Amino acid sequence: MKTLYTAVSTAHGGRDGHVRSSDGIVDLDLRTPKEMGGPGGAGTNPEQLFASGYAACFESAMRVVARKQKLPLADASVTGHVSFNVTEQGKYVLSVELHGKVEGVSHEEAEALMRAAHEVCPYSNATRGNIEVKLVAE
């Protein structure tokens, strides 16, 4: 395996702390959402960061697949929904829904494009077999 890029971030204080990337571009306060018993308020959380990263990566994968398949992709967007869940056994797990909007192709083509992107997206490859990921073409 050949490494093309490595991102580095450091977190302090857990869900109610701070996260900063090595280059300082990401420099964010973290807050546990009220829904999870935290203070909420100004600050992000790991689920929002994961949803943002997965959505951006997946949309890029859709563009790569569309280019290879010569699909006319006028415009596209992906919205990531990352849920923090607890199983009946008390285990904490994430689940993901990716909602894709694709201009210039039929609904069936959009679904096929999302399925193909799911096979090449690095986030999809990392999560496959580990968490539930649902694809929704809108």
Where are these regions (language model features)?
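Extended beta-strand/beta-hairpin segments
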Residues: 1-52, 59-138
